[in-house]
Amino acid sequence: MKKNLLFLILVINTFTGYSQKAYNNNIIKCFSEDSISSFALPGVNATVLGSVFAEKSKYPSMFLQSDNWYPAIYLYECMGLKNGVPYYDDPVSISMPSELGYSLNGDILEIDGAVYGFWIKGKQLIETRYNEDDKSFEQTRLLNIEGLDVSPSAVSVWKERGKLYCLLEVGDGKKIGGPVHWENKDFPPYDSRGFFVGNLVYSGLYGFIIEDNDVWPISVKAVPQTDLKQVMWGYKKISYVTYPNGEKGVITGSHNGNFLYYPISGHEDRIVENRRFVVDENDILIRHNTIWARPIPFYNDVNDHIGMIVSGEGGIYYYPFAGFNKQGNPIYGKSRPLLAHQSDLYGGSLIVPNLVDWDGDGDLDMIVGNSIGNINFFENEGSNSDPKFKDAVPLCVYGKPIHIQPGYKDDIQGPQESRWGYVCPTVVDWNNDGLLDIITNDSRGKHRIFLNIGEKGKPVLDSESPLYLDGLEFHGTWRTRPGVARLGERMAYITQDEDDEFHLYWQIDTYNLEDGGKLKLTDGSFIGGSYFGKGGGTGRNKILIIDWDDDGVKDLLVGTPRYGTIPNKQIGLPFNAGDKGAAVLFLRNAGTNNEPVYDFPKMIKYLGKTIHFGQHSCAPTVGNLKTKDGLDLIVGDQKGRFYFFERKDLSW
């Protein structure tokens, strides 16, 4: 068993996703009068590598690297600005040398009229040159880097006065050291005092300067530019920038979302000056919307720096440049989503959609949670028979967008995941006042309610409040969407319990639940959730209570992670049906609404074939859209796309 588990861990860690091309035509496009809307990342997260001016282009094009789940590098041409924000054309795939692949840390820039990519592989700096004709990078030179105890990660390169300058991110050599969530069944990320048992690891900068001759030296020694306690968990991206006043420096991102700035010193014995910070117009350090902030500069048609583009998980944003403060810190304005032409409807990463008439105008909109921790409203500007979903609008509480963050201690995988909210909303009239409320679970495993205190057609959300079980704040496995609906005369609440099994609770009142027992299959067995029943492998299922087969009894539709094994590890789905990725399962209620009992799950099929959605999870929602008879299906995936499936094309 231990050998099989190790094999499964290795397979999951190298999984790069199964093709969803068979139903790419099912992806919902964003509706906009001018066809310009939020930029949709090609993966769960992405890294901006650099921006370059193509021939005759007014604004620089952008190179973007997708993640390990969807490894690729793309070039996006900037088509212009909309309200001061850049918008981009469709991506062009870029080829890389096979020995380099698509996942190395890199930096792309223009040097003497040509486009170069510089990549870190171990303790080597590899230069590649871009070939416009076949949209590829070709390796040209290689440099061995000495003087480092550990391999560098992020890199920035630029040329001045015939010399190449290089800055490297170098870690302090410590390992995070916390327990691995797949392996440790006890999984204690915090000690008895509440402190993380691993290390808060840091990085700093090394650098070197070489003559940019036709032939590089075989090796070069990198020397420290800073101490190694500059940034926690890493810079993620280092980018050279020239400001309109002539000042030059590098901007870095960070794991936690802050931005650092290092002015260029002008002295060859030390490339950069001491650390400064990137601040907002109130001189407060900017904390990016998402985890893994990765910045590159953006220039206008006369090559003046006018802003920065920042990628991360769940989105890509633009910050306008606003000058410097008295301390020499660069100032940037409020971030806005980067834009694209004819983009897919985009909800962030690991989205959890709900089809409901949120604004009370008679058609189905969507309320959607994501890994960032936001809950967004997607208005249907069309009709149910011809839906036209507009761009995301964040839902707010007393004027501030909902942004659930676990912080230092509320994420079961440790403080390095403090920025992942993984909010999973269920929209339902919970207190029977005729208004739709929002119930959530998230990365904290905390079940909360946002009561609607507005009026019909004008929803207003109150602050989140706990739900209680036997007087204690109700807690469950993380990242599940609770299934909430009326079963018979009572409101049912289904989620996964401490055994990672499906569990029924009944509503007592607006804030209190009572135990209804574990749910069972018709053979009397409990319904387990995951191959990994401990740590971060638990939970994650997205539960929907709905009469799917139209027999008058409400069933379960469940969006699973890839390694979901419902109802048990031995034969559970979808993992044991060929390991093809996350899926949507149908559990028919063979009992009654008052006493539900379920058949063995079946996998939802589109045009006769099971549908799959990558690694982390997928989330179903249903409604009468194209179909008057029966419920159509929308599935949100880990890349933030919404897939529409008409009922007539579905089977199980």
What feature does the model see in each segment?
Residues M1-A22:
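Bacterial Sec-dependent N-terminal signal peptides
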Residues Q20-W652:
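Beta-propeller-forming repeat regions
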